[in-house]
A protein has these predicted regions:
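Outer membrane beta-barrel
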Residues: 81-235, 262-280, 350-356, 360-379
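Bacterial N-terminal signal peptides that target proteins for export
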Residues: 2-15
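Extracellular/periplasm-exposed beta-strand and loop segments of Gram-negative cell-envelope proteins
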Residues: 184-186, 196-204, 209, 239-242, ...
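N-terminal periplasmic/intermembrane-space "pro-region" immediately following the signal or transit peptide
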Residues: 2-3, 19, 23, 27-105
């Protein structure tokens, strides 16, 4: 492209103007030949000056239009291809699970009820590659108020720090590593509308304590957990309430709500996953539980053994757990005459089998059956003739039903439960649950 000369136009205009003025002046006056010659010489000199300025201006513009010399040739870049870049995990992750259930007793249909059993929101935030915080907030039965049966509770709130690839430290409020259900209690993680009785009446799921915990994970499939935590509070035992008969430990756990911490507990758990599809494990918890409020010290101990095997389409699971409370004779003496005394021992056992009958893409139909045996007051300490309560009758429950999964995160459930002792409790259950 020919370079433009933005400054040349004013110079030409000046020359034209000068000539016009000169000619006009010559026509307006009678000039002598000498005067005319002088004016022509002056105009010639001015014209030469303007030409020199124009040449100088053109040279400047040409130099400006030339590219600057490169110090070194730049390497030719390869064509940019839209490669798929791995997406980094977000630092903060929202989690949730929930259960909406319907229960209809077979002998008293008028007592059927529907309930938002649980709604939980949580988040995990990773501060760096080694440290994160885990929290969950739970609402039970939809509404919590002075006139409603609902409850709002913090289910988890702890910091986890990865000391090395095999060892992690947790501090705060965390779930106890007991049984199969307590740490994995989302509705998509268990069969049936309701959680099994063994891991709710004997193991008080969802059971959490505040403290510190070490978690070791090894290449041979072994995971070890252990630590120091808060304990139960036997001073919360209400001998006039039926809560202790429903779940002895569930009625006296503190959930770290202004928890009395004079007495603490130790716990340990081991789980082995060395063979694909097989889990073998066990746990033990033991700690004083009178919190310096009673003359007699009392220790609560709970242990369990559990296994799960998932060969092909099958899914088998079993848990046995047993709990004991020491020195209950001294604790029960002032409670004699009330309906619910403190049991010396309690235990439970279940076996369960499920089968993936049909699946297509994300859909799956899984019928299952579960048989349970549990006793929340298997024995009492001797209080003397006529004062010692009789052991409770061992309850046996069979649950038959099916889970229909829309995906790994959404499940519809239906089942029937039959009780051997409390036959009035026989019922049909429907439910829907989710987790992410």
């Amino acid at each position: 492209m020919t370079p433009s000369h933005p400054r040349a136009l004013p110079a030409r205009s000046l020359l034209a103007t000068a000539l016009a003025l000169a000619l006009g002046s010559a026509q307006a006056q009678t000039a002598t030949e000498a005067e005319l010659a002088r004016k022509l010489d002056q105009l010639a000199s001015e014209l030469a000056t303007v030409k020199a300025q124009l040449v100088q201006l053109q040279q400047q513009q040409q130099r400006a239009a030339q590219p600057a010399p490169a110090a070194a040739p730049a390497p030719v870049a390869a064509p940019v291809v839209a490669a798929e870049v791995p997406r980094a995990e977000p630092a903060t992750v929202l989690t949730s699970y929930g259960e909406i259930n319907y229960n209809r007793p077979t002998k008293a249909g008028q007592n059927a009820q529907a309930d938002i059993r649980r709604f939980v929101l949580g988040y995990q935030h990773r501060f760096d590659d080694k440290t994160k915080v885990v929290t969950e907030l739970e609402v039970e039965h939809a509404v919590a108020s002075a006139s409603d049966a609902g409850e709002v509770a913090i289910e988890q709130a702890f910091i986890e720090h990865q000391i090395n690839p095999s060892l992690a430290l947790r501090a705060g409020l965390f779930l106890m590593p007991v049984g199969l259900l307590n740490e994995n209690h989302e509705p998509t993680a268990f069969y049936g509308v309701e959680r099994n009785f063994v891991e709710t009446a004997i193991i008080p799921s969802t059971w959490r304590e505040g403290g510190i915990q070490l978690v070791g994970s090894f290449d041979n499939g072994l995971t070890l957990q252990g630590g120091l935590t808060t304990s139960f509070d036997l001073n919360k035992w209400d001998a006039k309430s039926a809560d202790g008969r429903k779940s002895p430990l569930g009625s006296i756990h503190q959930e770290m709500a202004l928890a009395k911490a004079h007495d603490v507990a130790l716990f340990g758990a081991a789980n082995w996953r060395g063979i694909p599809g097989l889990l073998l494990g066990g746990s033990v918890f033991s700690g004083q539980a009178t919190q310096a409020q009673a003359v007699t010290q009392s220790r609560i101990t709970l242990w369990d053994l559990h296994a799960r095997w998932t060969p092909g389409r099958w899914d088998f699971a079993t848990v046995y757990t047993r709990g004991s409370i020491s020195n209950t004779a001294a604790l029960n003496t002032p409670l004699v005459g009330n309906d619910t005394l403190i049991p010396k021992s309690f235990d439970g056992f279940y076996v369960q089998g499920a089968y993936r009958l049909w699946s297509s893409e994300d859909y799956a139909l899984l019928p299952f059956v579960r048989w349970e045996r549990f006793n929340t007051a298997k024995s009492y300490a001797d209080l003397g003739a006529g004062l010692t309560p009789e052991a409770a009758r061992t309850e046996r429950v069979i649950t038959v039903g099916a889970d229909f999964r829309l995906s790994q995160n959404i499940v519809f459930k239906a089942d029937y439960q039959r009780f051997r002792e409390a036959t009035d409790a026989n019922r049909y259950n429907l439910g829907v649950g989710w987790s992410f």
